[in-house]
Amino acid sequence: APMAEGEQKPREEVKFMDVYKRSYCRPIEMLVDIFQEYPDEIEYIFKPSCVPLMRCGGCCNDESLECVPTEEFNITMQIMRIKPHQGQHIGEMSFLQHSKCECRPKKEKARQENPCGPCSERRKHLFVQDPQTCKCSCRNTDSRCKARQLELNERTCRCDKPRR
């Protein structure tokens, strides 16, 4: 049977350039705990409890550099949200994926280079910021809020009750 890409036969030697290319800084699928992305939603149990996301990972081959995202986008996934003793429903949740990664100077140096102020002092997890333009956008989507009979507040990025 033909082998899947990346699959190795037992005791096969992997060539240096293959090892180097596959270990260098790049977007790679990682399993991310939903509570890491939504730390305030402790009243729910999520099924699944983690999701596969493309995130930057790998080596930069220089101690002063780190692998960081240079392009990101949101992806919406259907997740079961369970509220113990109250019920469950499948709803949409938005997650950040990395589409491009680069080796950049580590945070101490990057902090002076980063002219962007934070999107919000409180509830930082509700916002996504473009590192190039400093533009802030909401992780929540209008359709996600509407599915819960709520509307997206663009200023706070929260789903609020519609005003009458």
From Swiss-Prot:
Q: Where is this protein localized, as stated in its record?
A: Secreted
Q: Which residues cross the membrane?
A: none
Keywords carried by this UniProt record: Angiogenesis, Developmental protein, Differentiation, Disulfide bond, Glycoprotein, Growth factor, Mitogen, Secreted
- Sorted alphabetically, which Pfam families does this protein's record hold? PDGF, VEGF_C
Signal sequence annotation:
none
In the record, biological process GO terms are: induction of positive chemotaxis; motor neuron migration; positive regulation of angiogenesis; positive regulation of cell division; positive regulation of endothelial cell migration; positive regulation of endothelial cell proliferation; positive regulation of focal adhesion assembly; positive regulation of mast cell chemotaxis
* Glycan attachment sites: 74
Q: What does the record give under GO molecular function?
A: chemoattractant activity; growth factor activity; heparin binding; vascular endothelial growth factor receptor binding
- What InterPro entries does UniProt report for this protein, alphabetically? Cystine-knot_cytokine, PD_growth_factor_CS, PDGF/VEGF_dom, PDGF/VEGF_growth_factor, VEGF_C, VEGF_C_sf
Which cysteine pairs are joined by S-S bonds?
Answer: 25-67, 56-101, 60-103
Q: Do you know which PROSITE patterns this protein is assigned to?
A: PDGF_1, PDGF_2
Q: Cellular component GO terms, alphabetically?
A: extracellular space; membrane
Q: Which PANTHER family match?
A: VASCULAR ENDOTHELIAL GROWTH FACTOR (PTHR12025), VASCULAR ENDOTHELIAL GROWTH FACTOR A, LONG FORM (PTHR12025:SF5)
General function of this protein:
Growth factor active in angiogenesis, vasculogenesis and endothelial cell growth. Induces endothelial cell proliferation, promotes cell migration, inhibits apoptosis and induces permeabilization of blood vessels. Binds to the FLT1/VEGFR1 and KDR/VEGFR2 receptors, heparan sulfate and heparin. Binding to NRP1 receptor initiates a signaling pathway needed for motor neuron axon guidance and cell body migration, including for the caudal migration of facial motor neurons from rhombomere 4 to rhombomere 6 during embryonic development. Also binds the DEAR/FBXW7-AS1 receptor.
Q: Which family does it belong to?
A: Belongs to the PDGF/VEGF growth factor family.
Record note on quaternary structure:
Homodimer; disulfide-linked. Also found as heterodimer with PGF. Interacts with NRP1. Interacts with BSG.
Q: What is this protein called?
A: Vascular endothelial growth factor A
- Gene name, per UniProt, is VEGFA
